[in-house]
Regions:
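Membrane-embedded alpha-helical bundles of multi-pass transporters/translocases
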Residues: 1-217
Length: 217
């Protein structure tokens, strides 16, 4: 469940504050900021297909999904910190920087959360235990979102000392460090006990199914 708490430190920060940060702190126009969010989600949707394929083929002594909780969270924290950093660049340079960092943030978020979300099925085959895991996850996800909502603006003011650029950068850095520690706690405190069914992932077949789906379009 602490993984959901850690995930929501990022997700709720993006949902609640990123658009405001882009327009009022970073200095982007609303249309440009909106296009960045849209393009990043499209790129992430394609990335998720290949990431799922890679996870299916992952075989390590730590399991299939747990290794991602070890190496990916620092990348996610770094991408979040970069996203909420205002570079000293020209207006066009800042737009390119915003595109690059937010796309990187979305890719790293998926790199952590897709394998994390798949873990309950590998931790236990008992439906009662899985239900309990879901309850813990929901509670801690809500708690993480509540912390972001309550603490972000006071932390921005306190850590920035009136400088909102520094305040957002420092606040996201602090949340990133906390999230890495929580994901590593999740890695250390879990063990994949359920062997996945042997199957050969067919990426081409899955892409054909998706492209033919009316829901996708």
């Amino acid at each position: 469940g602490v993984g959901d708490f850690a995930s929501n430190l990022f997700w709720q920060s993006i949902s609640m504050f990123l658009m405001f940060f882009y327009t009022d702190v970073f200095g982007l126009g609303a249309a440009v900021a909106g296009s960045i969010l849209f393009v990043a989600r499209v790129v992430d949707a394609v990335w998720d297909l290949f990431l799922g394929y890679a996870i299916d083929r992952t075989r390590t002594r730590w399991g299939r999904c747990r290794p991602y909780l070890l190496f990916a969270p620092p990348l996610l924290a770094l991408a979040a910190w970069a996203t909420f950093t205002v570079p000293n660049l020209s207006p066009d340079g800042k737009v390119l920087y915003a595109y690059a960092t937010y796309i990187a943030l979305m890719l790293c978020y998926s790199l952590v959360n897709i394998p994390y979300s798949a873990m309950p099925a590998l931790l236990s085959a008992n439906p009662v235990e899985r239900t309990r895991l879901a309850e813990y996850r929901m509670f801690l996800a809500f708690s993480g979102g509540l912390l972001v909502a309550a603490a972000t603006l006071p932390l921005v003011e306190w850590l920035g000392g009136g400088d909102r650029k520094l305040g957002y950068q420092s606040t996201v850095l602090a949340m990133g460090v906390l999230s890495v520690l929580l994901f590593w706690t999740c890695f250390a405190g879990t063990q994949e006990r359920v062997a996945p069914l042997p199957q050969r992932p067919d990426l081409k077949g899955e892409l054909r199914i998706i492209l033919r789906s009316r829901t996708w379009w």
